[in-house]
Amino acid sequence: MFTNLMIQRKPHDRFFDEIIGCEDIKRLFRMALDSAQPVHVLLSGPPASAKTLFLQSLMTLKDSYFVDGSNASKSGMIEYIFDNKPKYLLIDEIDKMASKDQSFLLNLMETGILSETKHRKTRAITNVKTWVFATSNNISKVMLPLQSRFFVVNLEPYTYEQFYQITVELLTKQHKVKEEIAEATANTIWDKSANVRDCVKIGRMARSLEDVIFIVDNFMMHSQPNVLVKG
């Protein structure tokens, strides 16, 4: 009697399909999105990972608000939240926000209350249901009280096999790079910087294997290996 039943995907199951691997992290994000009450998630790890890709996927959600931590200000975010009441607040590189700018999130995330005093006048909103998703390159620069309000996920380094697969699929599928050039780029950059961003830069320019070798030999001689993280 069950042979004709089709398994229906939940609304959030389609998110993160473009991110290779990290299935456990994808599942955690989907569980947070499906939660009846706000659950906040912070992805922490070195640069050159796909942390930002998770936030970019969430930007397609209705009522989402994306913030670059390096340019964010407390006053600007408070003003936006008062005016628009976004359901999802997405903060990339939250560790680059000053402590005074991070602090306003404490009450919002803990109690759903947002208040502000200006020119001796106070305004406040209560029962704000805002999910906060953030990334951090250096979690030590995120206030400890703020860390405690997040479900913190520390990302693990990629193996060579994971780096190779991710780079080749990223270059061939998203950037339309020929497979042989993508493979050569992955192999070469692993020994130089192990940085996916470097692979993308080369993939966008190289039209042949000779181009890959030329770029790497002449312009990446002083690159230092980076720790690339899963996620």
List PLM regions with ranges.
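Walker A/P-loop
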Residues: 33-67, 82
